[in-house]
Amino acid sequence: MDVFSEYLAGIADPFHRERTEEVLTWIKNKYPNLHTEIKWNQPMFTDHGTFIIGFSVSKKHLAVAPEKVTIAHVEDDIVKAGYDYTEQLIRIPWNGPVDYTLLEKMIEFNILDKADCSTFWRK
């Protein structure tokens, strides 16, 4: 998690920092083969050089960016979780629970779906 230390230290709100660290640590522990990176000032996880999932912090939520194909794949689960979303990101409100089952579903979908992907983003 050293890669994310500076990013986390820059999150002013202690609760937001703790929640973000909790999510990033959960992913790192659950998927130890994924690489941790900071790109575009966002913590993200990659696999063989291809993007798997990324995050950003805002005043009202933790934004999750798994790529739009993945959001379409899990759209029903996003609705069931009660999260607001666009075609590119999902908003997990700070005052609500993190649906780790949904995160797992998105990460596993991307790992499998992008197994043969040779680019950072899907084409």
From Swiss-Prot:
Binds 1.0 Fe(2+) to 1.5 to 3.2 Fe(2+) per monomer. Disruption phenotype: Reduced growth in rich medium, unable to grow in minimal medium. Reduced activity of Fe-S-dependent aconitase (citB). Reactive oxygen species are drastically reduced. No bacillibactin (BB), an endogenous siderophore, produced. 20% higher intracellular iron concentrations. This is Intracellular iron chaperone frataxin. GO terms for cellular component: cytoplasm. Pfam families: DUF1801 (PF08818). Keywords: Cytoplasm, Ion transport, Iron, Iron transport, Metal-binding, Transport. The gene is fra. It comes from Bacillus subtilis (strain 168). SUPFAM superfamilies: YdhG-like. The keyword Nucleotide-binding does not apply. It is found in: Cytoplasm. Its cofactor is Fe(2+). The keyword Magnesium does not apply. Plays an essential role in iron intracellular trafficking to iron cofactor biogenesis systems including iron-sulfur cluster (Fe-S) or heme assembly. Promotes the biosynthesis of iron-sulfur clusters by delivering Fe to the complex composed of the cysteine desulfurase SufS and the zinc-dependent sulfurtransferase SufU. Also plays a critical role in coproporphyrin-dependent heme b biogenesis and thus provides an essential function for the bacterial global metabolism. GO terms for molecular function: metal ion binding. InterPro entries: YdhG-like. One of its GO terms (biological process) is iron ion transport. Homodimer, upon Fe(2+) binding. Interacts with the SufS/SufU complex. Interacts with CpfC.
